[in-house]
UniProtKB/Swiss-Prot annotation:
Entry keyword Ribonucleoprotein: yes
Summary of subunit composition and partner proteins: Homodimer. Part of the ribosomal stalk of the 50S ribosomal subunit. Forms a multimeric L10(L12)X complex, where L10 forms an elongated spine to which 2 to 4 L12 dimers bind in a sequential fashion. Binds GTP-bound translation factors.
Gene name linked to the record: rplL
HAMAP family the UniProt entry points to: Ribosomal_bL12
GO cellular component: cytosolic large ribosomal subunit
Lyase among keywords: no
Gene3D superfamilies, A to Z: 3.30.1390.10, Single helix bin
Keywords associated with the record: Ribonucleoprotein, Ribosomal protein
InterPro entries xrefs: Ribosomal_bL12, Ribosomal_bL12_C, Ribosomal_bL12_C/ClpS-like, Ribosomal_bL12_oligo, Ribosomal_bL12_oligo_N_sf
GO terms of biological process kind: translation
Protein name (record): Large ribosomal subunit protein bL12
Family statement: Belongs to the bacterial ribosomal protein bL12 family.
């Protein structure tokens, strides 16, 4: 005879908190898993609670004014003319990666002022 999910839930509802903790520990030992890992990856709310700290600035298009975009890229990255032109022409491309939110917003503003289309990821 097998136990149904409802029977398991009913048995859990009747347990004290300490008994549930002991049950979880026993299940972790038996199956070689950790309940903490399941909790972290379990819900969409868990990911929303953690704020992203590193951002990538992606140039999606150089826009109508390619020259202004190249100048803005050179100023932001320190690249030479040839490298900045290559970056502008190979969009979509990451301009800077793993930077702070403030840096990403400032870079996006500068590039958009030059006419480029930019995303922050």
């Amino acid at each position: 005879m097998s136990i149904t999910k409802d029977q398991i839930l009913e048995a859990l509802a009747e347990m004290s908190v300490m008994e549930v903790v002991e049950l979880i520990e026993a299940m972790e030992e038996k199956f070689g898993v950790s309940a903490a890992a399941a909790v972290v990856s379990g819900g969409a709310d868990a990911g929303a609670a953690e704020e992203q700290t590193e951002f990538d600035v992606i140039l999606t298009s150089h826009g109508d004014n390619k020259v202004a975009t190249i100048k803005a890229l050179r100023a932001a990255t320190g690249l030479g003319l040839k490298e900045a032109k290559g970056m502008a022409e190979s969009a979509p491309v990451a301009v800077k990666e793993a930077i702070t939110k403030e840096e990403a917003e400032a870079l996006k503003t500068d590039l958009e002022a030059a006419g480029a289309a930019v995303e922050i990821k």
